[in-house]
Structures are given as C-alpha cells and as structure tokens.
Amino acid sequence: RVYAEVSRILREETDEIEARYPDLKRNVSGYNLDHLLENAREHDAVNLGRLLAGSEGTLAVITEAEVSLEPIPDSKAVVLLTYDGVISAMRDVAPILEHDPSAVEVMDDVMLDLARNTGEFADLVATLPEGTDSTLLVEFYADSMDEARRKIADLLADRLPGYEAAVEPSESHLETSADTHAIDALEAYDPDRQAKFWKMRKSGLPILLSRTGDDKHWPFVEDTAVPPEHLPEYVADLQDLFDSHDTFAAYYAHAGPGVLHIRPLLNLKAADEEVTSTGDRES
C-alpha cells in the first residue's frame, strides 16, 4: 500500500515536484520527493530508501541499513581566501564551486574579531593579511599532493589573479566569468596547518559564546539553505533586517551548500516585543 501510494504521488504530482523543489545540495525542504522522482525515472522503480533518507523518523523506524561509502582520497589541500567583507565572500562562493572543492566554509568579521581575543586562535588571526574582514576556507581532495597543489593553484589563478601560488596552475585551468573579490590567500599543505584552519572554523560556536555581557549570539536563524548564487542577496537582506533593529549577526559555516549558521546578537533580557519582531520578520 505504501509503495502504491508513493508511486501515485510521484505520478500525479510530477509537475508540482519539479516546479517547487529548489535546486539545493542539501535538502531542507521536506521529504526527498525530487530525488525519489529522479531515481524512479532512472531505474523504472520506486526506491523507498530514498524517501526515508532525511525523513528524521517521521515515516518509519530504520532498524538495519546497508550503506555504500566512497573512499576518501589520500591527499587534500586547503586555502584560506580573504575578503574585505562577508558580502564579497558570498559573491565568490558560486564561482569557487565550479572548481569542485570538497568544502567551502565562511568565517565572517564577527567570528574573526572574537577569535582574535582567544588564546587558541589569536596567533592564527594575526597572520591574516591586512584588510581581511571575512574568509572562505576552501578544501580540495586529490589522489596525490601534487594534484592537490595544482587544484589550489588553478583556483587561485581564477579567483585571485596575480597571486603566486606554491606551484604553477595548469595551462588549461578553469577560468570563470565572474568578477573576482578575494584580496589575498593563505595556502595550507601541511596537515598541522590545515588542522589549525579547520579547528578555528569548527570552533565557531565556542568562539561566539565567548562574548561577554548580556548580548549573545542566539541560534534562531539556522540552516536556512539557499542556492549559493543567491547568498550575496540573502545575506545583504538579513544585514538590513538586523540593522533596522540596531544589531548584527555572525555568519559562518557551510557556504558551499548554502547552509549558513546565522546568529543574531540579542539581549534576551530586553523587551519581548523586540525579539518577537525580529523573529517574525525573518520567518
């Protein structure tokens, strides 16, 4: 019965599914009917496992599963691209994705300013080039370190022309048509240096929680996924919203799939109507 009903939905609601589901790398828009439809067309059958994935226990309880895993390549390289503002960084996300990185993560000025005052990350923030307001951490996987270095060089040749990378870029490296916005870069091929970059990014929440006083960064604008090409407009609109309430937010984490962590600075000891107003306008 379940199989028949799901098949009916896919058959009768094909146009609605295709029209309404956004093109996102991470689905936060309900059940995976779009992927289920695509898989059904490819295999001429409905794989209910595709529907259960991401349903978070609302459709069935999984007691046993067989998972297909992809091996992680032996080598990886990281580059920290620096920008004069978070909007500039967001404008660079979509063209960076054309280079097929394994990760693109943002750290904005709010996070970097707080990290500057921590014992663990002060030295790292101090190495950022002058004028750095925000950064994008870009990681590539490769089958060899030579290939990893080349991927970084190809990216920098496209997104930061004139920068001298550790190796020369490929003669036929990808050149996107998008404007460039990065002001500098820090390459990382040593595992310890890479781990330091990643640790600061992954410590985003503890860094934000280090802020003293009644004003805190609260998590009610979380994981709102948007297509990466719309990130500049999305972040700019949010900045205008928070400005209208005389506050600001921290923007960090998963820029690649368009799933940002956005934590407005609020004093929950203040009048309820101010907090409610901000939340209502965002929702």
Residue ranges of predicted features:
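Noncatalytic alpha-helical scaffold of FAD-dependent oxidoreductases
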Residues: R1-A253, G258-S283
